[in-house]
């Protein structure tokens, strides 16, 4: 990540002064910077201040260069699906950035489950007489009526029966009240999908939240559209966070738009009069000194845990919405390995994308061949397994690669599990550098609830009478995805600030 921006500098504030701005934006992640960027294009003369609690921008986008000029180590948000993520695609186009397709779910990749080595293709091939499929049927005791159908086809057909309109427009899944108010697993059971096949689906997805986390059915359908591998995944050339840096460079060259890093918000006192100014108390996190900001409106681009720390008259509906979200934990470890190790794990370069297992090392990616890099990725209970190996001092800083000796127990356990999955002697796995991070709340997902109603009401967390707004992927129809963050910000700017949607703008060209 760049330590400074190429065309502008970060401003500092004299805490003895009370600043007055038109718009205060809290949060330097994708939705916060997007909001400032789009406002600067429509209202260059407005005075806008963006604050970010950390010493760097990007929010849950953390891209680290490791020698590959195209693909970075994506410690947070990792990939985009252009046919689904329309807002991300539009931003990439407008910034003149590039994205490239990267292998994801390849049929010959390893699937190590129940102490048995299969290929990922085992869930899709048929008929049941196929040796790979026979193993899968025996391991998971798949019922006869589901044995000759691919797991993805069973899951897709069940979703179509529950939400007939979703193949034409996946956003319509949220129009079905029953899908918002029941779990993904309950929906499958109602549609006749066995618990055995549901288990196969979750295990082979490489994730551990579809069934075990009790997601709302509508949310589960949406997530599977991306995660299923039916659509091509792309990585942003130069790192996913480069979209934030690109928007930043274009925004803060304008002296009316200011950016304060190392600045958190502690309190919001809304104005009692319709045209009055809201008062926000900020704190310089380096000095502890308070800063008072008065603004006509506030855009909060913050996740659930950050919103909960702000002292403000938050409405009961907002509290209800926040309580309806469940946290999603994640763990990633990027290993820079020698060429021999990479050849072993990638099966001499034949394996691309990721293999899966039911071990805590749920996903193992042949991430980069030059330089050789392997990624271990897992979530929720499996991520929690790795938490005991985490050094909090390292985990809480912007990630970087370290000598493996810095955490020998972690490296040893990673090598042990990789060895089991790929039938490789752990002593032959050579790790030269390691980068790792445990995300306590990498995203938030909806539990069964009245999702559309709650998401609409939470847009104005202090009530509709106040010009204080909330954006971010947590309250979007694409939870956990950058596109969700941009979608909420774009909708807000259109509705309350008269900014043209970037999607409509793209249609003009």
Swiss-Prot record:
The protein's GO terms of the molecular function aspect are: oxidoreductase activity
Primary location class = virion
Taxonomic lineage is:
Viruses, Varidnaviria, Bamfordvirae, Nucleocytoviricota, Megaviricetes
Task: Recite the UniProt keywords alphabetically.
Answer: Virion
| Pfam families per UniProt | Amino_oxidase
Q: Write down any Gene Ontology CC term.
A: virion component
Write the protein's name: Uncharacterized protein R188
Record's subcellular location: Virion
The species is: Acanthamoeba polyphaga mimivirus
């Amino acid at each position: 990540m760049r330590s400074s921006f190429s065309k502008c500098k970060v401003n500092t504030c004299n805490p003895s002064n009370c600043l007055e701005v038109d718009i205060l934006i809290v949060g330097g992640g994708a939705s916060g910077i997007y909001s400032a960027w789009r406002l600067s294009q429509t209202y260059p003369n407005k005075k806008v201040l963006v604050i970010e609690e950390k010493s760097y921008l990007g929010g849950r986008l953390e891209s680290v260069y490791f020698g590959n000029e195209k693909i970075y180590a994506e410690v947070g948000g990792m990939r985009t699906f252009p046919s689904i993520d329309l807002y991300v695609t539009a931003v990439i186009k407008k910034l003149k950035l590039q994205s490239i397709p990267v292998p994801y779910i390849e049929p010959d990749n390893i699937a190590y489950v129940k102490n048995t080595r299969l290929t990922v293709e085992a869930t899709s091939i048929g008929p049941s007489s196929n040796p790979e499929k026979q193993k899968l049927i025996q391991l998971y005791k798949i019922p006869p009526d589901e044995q000759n159908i691919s797991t993805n086809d069973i899951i897709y057909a069940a979703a179509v029966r529950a939400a007939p309109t979703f193949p034409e427009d996946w956003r319509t899944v949220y129009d079905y009240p029953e899908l918002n108010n029941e779990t993904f697993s309950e929906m499958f059971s109602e549609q006749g999908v066995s618990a055995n096949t549901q288990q196969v689906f979750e295990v082979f997805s490489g994730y551990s939240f579809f069934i075990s986390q009790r997601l709302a059915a509508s949310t589960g359908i949406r997530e599977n559209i991306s995660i299923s591998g039916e659509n091509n995944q792309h990585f942003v050339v130069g790192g996913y966070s480069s979209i934030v840096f690109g928007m930043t460079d274009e925004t803060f060259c304008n002296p009316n738009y200011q950016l304060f890093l190392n600045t958190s918000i502690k309190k919001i006192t809304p104005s009692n009069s319709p045209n009055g100014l809201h008062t926000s108390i900020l704190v310089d996190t380096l000095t502890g000194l308070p800063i008072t900001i008065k603004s006509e409106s506030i855009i909060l681009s913050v996740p659930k845990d950050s919103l909960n720390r702000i002292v403000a008259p938050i409405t009961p509906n907002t509290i209800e919405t926040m309580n309806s979200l469940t946290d999603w934990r994640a763990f990633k470890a990027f290993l820079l390995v020698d060429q021999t190790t990479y050849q072993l794990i990638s099966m001499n370069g034949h394996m691309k994308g990721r293999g899966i297992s039911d071990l805590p090392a749920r996903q193992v990616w042949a991430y980069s061949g030059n330089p050789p890099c392997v990624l271990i990725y897992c979530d929720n209970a499996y991520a929690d397994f790795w938490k005991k190996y985490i050094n909090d001092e390292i985990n809480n800083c912007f990630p970087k690669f370290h000598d493996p000796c810095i955490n020998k127990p972690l490296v040893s356990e990673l090598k042990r599990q990789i060895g089991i999955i790929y039938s490789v002697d752990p002593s032959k796995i050579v790790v030269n550098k390691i980068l790792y991070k445990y995300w306590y709340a990498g995203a938030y997902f909806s539990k069964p609830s009245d999702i559309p109603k709650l998401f609409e009401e939470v847009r104005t967390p202090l009530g509709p009478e106040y010009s204080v707004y909330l954006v971010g992927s947590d309250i979007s129809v694409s939870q956990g995805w950058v596109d969700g963050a941009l979608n909420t910000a774009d909708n807000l700017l259109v509705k309350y600030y008269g900014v043209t949607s970037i999607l409509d703008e793209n249609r003009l060209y």
